[in-house]
């Protein structure tokens, strides 16, 4: 069986994950299928994604994959759910950390997001996910839910930094932080030689994200 290539990097400075609970052989096999499916989706794209291609990646029979995921849509949705929830869980753990100040929590999350979105495999994954959401109702519903969770997470850390912000203002700031990072991912992916240096773009993006959290007061 081939090893998994696509993995979320650890959140630098953030809390480490607890050891996973004991899994049954069935649970372990399902996770192996999903891990292979994430690789296939990122490398081959939405149009070429299939249970057969995942089975080939795992070097198992098609019926083995179909035993856990009966059709392509179920496999696709669960693949994207696993990837999206991986990010949300890591960032939620960072936000809940008592060892970090609110500002440090945001800085760690933004640093990690900016690092992840400059990875070619991560870019490919999210571009393909956005494309598939235009054609697959199940993927669209999942993406809407994950995006809502992501914006809520950012809104909460904004409120931690500046408690005086009204709920709507914090939601706007969180949404703009997400837009800043995702927009930068697109711009840098398709930018030409005239694009400003990445180091400068990342530095300014971090400052913009922090500035969005501050209104009539200093960040915590």
Spans of features found by a protein language model:
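Hydrophobic alpha-helical connector segments
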Residues: 78, 92-122, 173-177, 202
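Helix-turn-helix
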Residues: 29-32, 36, 40-74, 78
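N-terminal intrinsically disordered/low-complexity leader segments
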Residues: 1-28, 39, 216-220
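Short helix-capping/turn signature of helix-turn-helix
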Residues: 66-69, 115, 128-135
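Short, basic, alpha-helical segments at the C-terminal edge of helix-turn-helix-like DNA-binding modules
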Residues: 81-87
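Amphipathic alpha-helical packing segments from all-alpha helical-bundle domains
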Residues: 118-127, 137-162, 172, 199-203, ...
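Amphipathic C-terminal alpha-helical segment
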Residues: 115-119, 135, 177-196, 208-218
């Amino acid at each position: 069986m081939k090893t998994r290539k696509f993995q979320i990097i650890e959140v630098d400075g953030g809390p480490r994950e607890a050891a996973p609970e004991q899994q049954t052989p069935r649970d372990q096999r399902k996770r192996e299928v999903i891990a292979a499916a994430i690789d296939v989706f990122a490398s081959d794209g939405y149009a070429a994604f299939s249970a057969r291609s995942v089975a080939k990646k795992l070097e198992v029979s098609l019926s083995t994959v179909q035993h856990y995921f009966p059709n392509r849509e179920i496999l696709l949705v669960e693949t994207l759910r696993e990837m999206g929830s991986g990010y949300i869980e890591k960032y939620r753990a960072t936000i809940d950390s008592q060892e970090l100040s609110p500002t440090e929590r945001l800085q760690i999350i933004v640093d990690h997001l900016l690092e992840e979105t400059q990875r070619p495999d991560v870019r490919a994954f999210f571009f393909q996910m956005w494309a598939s959401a235009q054609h697959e109702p199940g993927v669209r519903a999942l993406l809407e839910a994950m995006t809502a969770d992501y914006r809520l997470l950012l809104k909460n850390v904004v409120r931690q930094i500046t408690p005086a912000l009204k709920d709507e203002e914090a939601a706007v700031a969180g949404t703009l932080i997400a837009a800043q990072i995702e927009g930068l991912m697109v711009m840098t992916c398709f930018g030409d030689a005239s694009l400003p240096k990445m180091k400068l773009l990342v530095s300014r993006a971090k400052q913009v994200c922090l500035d969005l959290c501050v209104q009539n007061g200093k960040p915590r």
